[in-house]
């Protein structure tokens, strides 16, 4: 039995040596093999950390996660089970799962493991506590982000508050410099903004987005890609707030100095470093959501984007302009819808599906602006492409038939509407079943059209019968009088 185990162990070691000693093409020289096998753990740890950073920056996320896992194992070998360095390795792994792969639950579990290690870690009195404080700060921040992604808003808020409080204490004690504190604040403020917005509390989110943008512009530059995310989310909050045009206009007229020229050419703008009586935060013009989107778009275009990135950026502006509901913004919305679609018009696969989705939004925009015939024409032309991209029995094709049916109804073409809605309900029955709300609603419309058609048919038959009766009935003269002839 012992001999069998020894043989198995020997075989396993041979496999390990073979795996280490052979690259994808050539065998590593013996000297390098010995270096790889007998390299001290701390040197291996340092190499793994560097490789994790390299893979992350080159967007090779799977390899980056693998290196972070190795870092945890090597840190345990180097420092033991209850050293703060192991907690730091778990925090880095949690950040990797959260930021690189979007796996919030795994990130939460690793962050909680790091918290447990820090709570039980044993350090010598002479050890510099700054590194431990920084590790704790990143732990609270990462755990807060993970809980936010899991929509556990109360727990997320508690951890973000701890991170913010600790960062202020570290700044006051000289553990971090002001520039480092501002960078930390930009992340924390953005997280708080997203936390409030995730609960549909746009009013509370608004000032945090403004602070996040301010700090991000200081640390990353105004034209950085990091600013794009904040600008877009800020624009979304401004739209959700309803814009408050009347209140802002009144405040502008009574309180503010001469307005500065609006970058879009409007005459409704005024300087921003003032407090709005509506929101009690730094005021931004009512069209500012669109301004933010255009700023973000210019940043994207300056970075030599791919067609997909350019399309996404233009699409954001089109949505912002369309959502404003203002007549002056219609041309802007159409311009950026067209720009977005042009960027990916000839794409295939997933991007082709994105093009068709944007095209549908554009058609909805055209319908709301009274261009219903143009919208219907585009939808009719898109049917073949949608069948090719999504299949005959797909939600996208069903919705297109529904929209075309409604367009025919609006034009009084009941027979055309009936035919298109009939196709729509067939697809919906296949996708969702005959008792689904969508299917039942479409079927109800079809039944109503059928009744109208039947009623119209009966009415026509009745009219024809009356006409036939009147023309075939004999013409009798008055009693005692003969008919008058032409001669008479």
UniProtKB/Swiss-Prot annotation:
SUPFAM superfamilies: TPR-like. Keywords: Cell projection, Repeat, TPR repeat. One of its GO terms (biological process) is positive regulation of smoothened signaling pathway. InterPro entries: TPR-like_helical_dom_sf (IPR011990), TPR_rpt (IPR019734), TTC23/TTC23L (IPR042621). Gene3D superfamilies: Tetratricopeptide repeat domain. Its main location: other. Associated with the EvC complex composed of EFCAB7, IQCE, EVC2 and EVC. Participates positively in the ciliary Hedgehog (Hh) signaling. This is Tetratricopeptide repeat protein 23. It comes from Mus musculus.
